[in-house]
Amino acid sequence: MGKTMFKKTLLFFTALFFTALCAFSANANVIITGTRVIYPAGQKNVIVKLENNDDSAALVQAWIDNGNPNADPKYTKTPFVITPPVARVEAKSGQSLRITFTGGEPLPDDRESLFYFNLLDIPPKPDAEFLAKHGSFMQIAIRSRLKLFYRPAKLSLDPFDAMKKVVFKATPKGVLVDNQTPYYMNYIGLLHQNKPAKNVKMVAPFSQAVFEAKGVRSGDKLKWVLVNDYGADQEGDAIAQ
């Protein structure tokens, strides 16, 4: 199983409307340290670190949404604020963004809540020499989107122990994954007789999902893979009930 990567949505814009020929610029300069954000309840804030390994400075915009990837950042309402929401990251340098829970709306205290951290990396405009040579160009602003889990303080079950509490049941359509824990289980793979199941996805707390597989019977051995708190692949075995 390969590492999962967070989704990147490409947002296109043009500085000069291109005609027949158009120079192309597509560089993801700014990198986010980590692949997910865990926000423990009661903590004053959490820090997201950025690194710009490019030779040019970059402008970034950050915001949090509650599950709609198409939501306009100006109108997205979540109980978090990011400081600063817009920042210039100098070449070969880093930048820290501070996420603070405002408590503007009550969240469940018996399970995790899921939000998404967004970062839009806007590349710098080409210099005069580039424009003189190409005349027109197209830039791509790269948007990175990471899961942000708000974790209540009263959850006594360790998240790694919770992985072992999930029950897998044989069904005519495949495997029913029954997650009766307070944590999101971000599955990326399930093997039955060395064959990968389909429709493998994240399963929310106290909910179920069916992973499609053929011929699964009670007593069959299964192997699952999910992404843990550290962004690493976590493997485990289970017996279908």
Swiss-Prot record:
Which Gene3D superfamilies does this entry report, sorted A to Z?
Immunoglobulins
The family database entries (SUPFAM superfamilies) matched by this protein are listed as: PapD-like, Periplasmic chaperone C-domain
Give a yes or no for keyword Ribosomal protein in this entry.
Answer: no
Signal peptide residues on this chain, from the entry's feature table = 1-27
Impact when changing residue 104 to S: In strain: AM30
PROSITE patterns, sorted: PILI_CHAPERONE
Assigned GO CC terms:
outer membrane-bounded periplasmic space
Give a single Pfam family match.
PapD_N
Q: Which InterPro entries match?
A: Ig-like_fold, PapD-like_sf, Periplasmic_pilus_chap, Pili_assmbl_chap_C_dom_sf, Pili_assmbl_chaperone_bac, Pili_assmbl_chaperone_C, Pili_assmbl_chaperone_CS, Pili_assmbl_chaperone_N
Ordered alphabetically, the record's keywords are: Chaperone, Fimbrium biogenesis, Immunoglobulin domain, Periplasm, Signal
Query: Which domain of life does the protein's organism represent?
Result: Bacteria
Subcellular location(s) per record: Periplasm
What is one process in the GO biological process aspect for this record?
cell wall organization
The record ties this protein, via PANTHER family, to: FIMBRIAL CHAPERONE YADV-RELATED (PTHR30251:SF2), PILUS ASSEMBLY CHAPERONE (PTHR30251)
User: What functional role does this protein have?
Assistant: Mediates assembly of pili by forming soluble multimeric complexes with pili subunits as an intermediate step in the assembly process. This protein is involved in type B pili (HifA) assembly.
Family designation: Belongs to the periplasmic pilus chaperone family.
Protein's UniProt name: Chaperone protein HifB
Organism source for this protein?
A: Haemophilus influenzae
